[in-house]
Amino acid sequence: MKKKIIYISVIVIILIIIIFLMKFNYKKINFGNNESNKSANEVKEYILNINSYTAELEVTINSNKNTNKYILRQEYVSGDIEKQTVIKPENIEGIEMSYKDGNIEINNSKLNLSKIYNNYPYLSDNVIWLNSFIDNCKKNPENVNVYEENEYIVMELNLTSNKYLVNRKLYLEKGTGKPKKMIVQDDNKKDVIYILYKEIDLNKK
């Protein structure tokens, strides 16, 4: 009888340990160096409160004419810096675009803004900026949907003001809360812009 009680006690203790470990690891999100359990909505709030970031991104843009791919570096500090530099392709490498008060300044290039608009669609558009996505989410909270999809938490924004840029989805890594990719679709659900975040640092400044 005594052995039976000991056996049952051991099983109960093991079950308690297993349950504790399962709860501890359930939906663990790592923001910086602090690990804690975060729901999808908490991740959403984390993203909406980003005030600075630096990123290297691979951007694929599908226009009516062709498909263009770029490697870009972006630097953003709320109220101060909003700068984008082209790394690839080589023929426009080094072009730097600075944004301030709704105006765009082109540096290190013989191309003017009208040529960039015509030859490189969306390259100078704020739709490829993470902070633009965040601003639109804040202005249109009723059009934002947050859900889990495989290994991602997805923030989906639907706006009908531009038929070419109706649906935007930001895919966030569950383990870190970091943006991994963004997809922008038109009203026919065709991918217009695909952004892959190769590197990104959030709120470093």
Which residues make up each language-model segment?
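Short, solvent-exposed coil/turn segments at beta-strand boundaries
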Residues: 49-54, 74-82, 98-103, 150, ...
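A generic structural motif
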Residues: 58-62, 85-89, 107, 158-160, ...
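A short, amphipathic edge element
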Residues: 133-145
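Short Pro/Gly-enriched beta-strand edge/turn motifs at strand-loop
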Residues: 55-56, 127-128, 153-154
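N-terminal leader/targeting segments and the immediate start of mature chains
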Residues: 2-81, 204
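An acidic-aromatic
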Residues: 73-127
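Gly/Pro-enriched, hydrophobic low-complexity segments
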Residues: 146-205
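Amphipathic hydrophobic-ligand
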Residues: 66-72, 93-99, 163-164, 190-194
